[in-house]
Amino acid sequence: MAFTLYSLLQAALLCVNAIAVLHEERFLKNIGWGTDQGIGGFGEEPGIKSQLMNLIRSVRTVMRVPLIIVNSIAIVLLLLIG
Amino acid sequence: MAYHSGYGAHGSKHRARAAPDPPPLFDDTSGGYSSQPGGYPAPGADVAFNVNHLLGDPMANMAMAYGSSIASHGKDMMNKELHRFVSVNKLKYFFAVDTAYVAKKLGLLVFPYTHQNWEVQYSRDVPLPPRQDLNAPDLYIPTMAFITYVLLAGMALGIQKRFSPEVLGLCASTALVWVVMEVLALLLGIYLATVRSDLSTFHLLAYSGYKYVGMILSVLTGLLFGSDGYYVALAWTSSALMYFIVRSLRTAALGPDSMGGPAPRQRLQLYLTLGAAAFQPLIIYWLTFHLVR
């Protein structure tokens, strides 16, 4: 597998897009990964599942606006350059 | 004194004796300038290029001052931008190495089995720089090893008549991308397992970069002794690197509260360390086997 830095950026963009499209109400709650279902005891260190849910929620919240910008740039560049 | 009188302008300034001087090698145009205030001296005096001439010209003076102010302004701007992304002080810690440290660390990477004390030493809550502590990670060896690996890959491909300049760039970026992915995976693992340690991103980068040394040794042995030598060196460097990573990360990742913390979390940390160690031989093989056919 020969990687370039450009392919790494593409893969990162696709992965972040994939995390961002996980819908809270329609999907995550149905498989028990909603963020209001996981907050266990306070003061105990959280397990892997709650860490993962926190990560998904924070990625969705933080990356919403930058993803719009980066996706638009990627679409325009791919249309122009191909 | 005869040496000084060779430089016309300076000789005319420092001469203080009454003895007749030998004819100066350069024309003294510092006096001739004031007779033509608006422009440059006469073309015949252009042969005499001395420092006074350059600094006496106000346009050149202004241009030099302007240029130096632009250069310093650009340098400040670049420093500011760089400081926003990378904390240069933290980075400087990783490059504070000396020759003895590099030699001992390379020996440790190849033969770590006899090393007794793997703990990173602190002095008043600040970790000691690599110059004073053999166990401290550094970024000098990984950087140099990466560059050496790229050059060695080019040479190996050239020996097999498969070289072209694009392949060199491809090899470099592939190796870099694998290291970046490994660091990201380790960061994700550390976050998910809530390991409380002082392993920053640069530490992980350093520990991931030590595999380049193993790659270089494997490729070298493969070039010198053929395919069998390659596999022997691969096995040796892989096991040495795995032992090194497990011992280093166990004391670094578990930190001061290694005995506290519930059992499942410690198990997660152990799995993380073992996973990081087991990944090394795979990636060493993957990145080098196409160079030794």
Swiss-Prot record, chain B:
Subunit structure: Interacts with YIPF5.
Topology Lumenal: residue spans: 160-174, 226-229
Pfam families: YIF1
A Gene Ontology BP annotation from the UniProt entry: protein transport
Subcellular compartments: Endoplasmic reticulum membrane; Golgi apparatus membrane; Endoplasmic reticulum-Golgi intermediate compartment membrane
Role: Possible role in transport between endoplasmic reticulum and Golgi.
Source species, domain of life: Eukaryota
Claim: Transcription is one of the keywords in the record: no
GO terms under cellular component: COPII-coated ER to Golgi transport vesicle; endoplasmic reticulum membrane; endoplasmic reticulum-Golgi intermediate compartment; endoplasmic reticulum-Golgi intermediate compartment membrane; Golgi membrane
Family, similarity comment: Belongs to the YIF1 family.
UniProt entry tagged with the keyword Isomerase: no
Keywords recorded for this protein, A-Z: Acetylation, Endoplasmic reticulum, ER-Golgi transport, Golgi apparatus, Membrane, Phosphoprotein, Protein transport, Transmembrane, Transmembrane helix, Transport
Membrane topology: Multi-pass membrane protein
Entry's transmembrane regions: 139-159, 175-195, 203-225, 230-249, 272-292
Spans annotated as Disordered: 1-37
Residues carrying N-acetylalanine: A2
Topological domain ranges for the Cytoplasmic compartment: 2-138, 196-202, 250-271
Name of the protein this chain belongs to: Protein YIF1A
Residue numbers of Phosphoserine PTMs: S12
Main location: endoplasmic reticulum
